From Swiss-Prot:
Origin superkingdom: Eukaryota
Subunit structure: Monomer in solution; Homodimer and oligomer in the presence of negatively charged lipids forming a pore with a size ranging between 20 and 30 Angstroms.
UniProt GO cellular component terms: extracellular region; membrane; other organism cell membrane
One Pfam family it belongs to: Toxin_cobra-type
UniProt record similarity statement: Belongs to the three-finger toxin family. Short-chain subfamily. Type IA cytotoxin sub-subfamily.
Compartment(s) where it occurs, according to its Swiss-Prot or TrEMBL record: Secreted; Target cell membrane
Keywords per UniProt: Cardiotoxin, Cytolysis, Disulfide bond, Membrane, Secreted, Target cell membrane, Target membrane, Toxin
Annotated protein name in UniProt: Cytotoxin 1
Function: Shows cytolytic activity on many different cells by forming pore in lipid membranes. In vivo, increases heart rate or kills the animal by cardiac arrest. In addition, it binds to heparin with high affinity, interacts with Kv channel-interacting protein 1 (KCNIP1) in a calcium-independent manner, and binds to integrin alpha-V/beta-3 (ITGAV/ITGB3) with moderate affinity.
InterPro entries membership: Cytotoxin_Cobra, Snake_3FTx, Snake_toxin-like_sf, Snake_toxin_con_site, Toxin_cobra-type
GO terms, biological process: killing of cells of another organism
Chief site of localization: secreted
Length: 60
C-alpha cells in the first residue's frame, strides 16, 4: 500500500502491518489535515484530533 505524506506530491510505501492510509485533523479545525501517512488501526480519535482512514493506494 502507498500512502500520501503531508506534502501532496510525496508518498511512501507502508511497512508490513500498517495497511491503512490516514489523514489526521485537529478537531477544532477539521478541514485541513495536519498529518498523513500509514496506520495500523483505525479509527482513532481523541479530544484534540481525529483520524480519517482508507485502504487504497494514495487515497489520503
Amino acid at each position: 500500500l502507498e500512502c500520501n505524506k503531508l506534502v501532496p506530491i510525496a508518498h511512501k510505501t507502508c511497512p508490513a502491518g500498517k495497511n491503512l492510509c490516514y489523514q489526521m485533523y485537529m478537531v477544532s479545525k477539521s478541514t485541513i489535515p495536519v498529518k498523513r501517512g500509514c496506520i495500523d488501526v483505525c479509527p482513532k480519535s481523541s479530544l484534540l484530533v481525529k483520524y480519517v482512514c482508507c485502504n487504497t493506494d494514495r487515497c489520503n
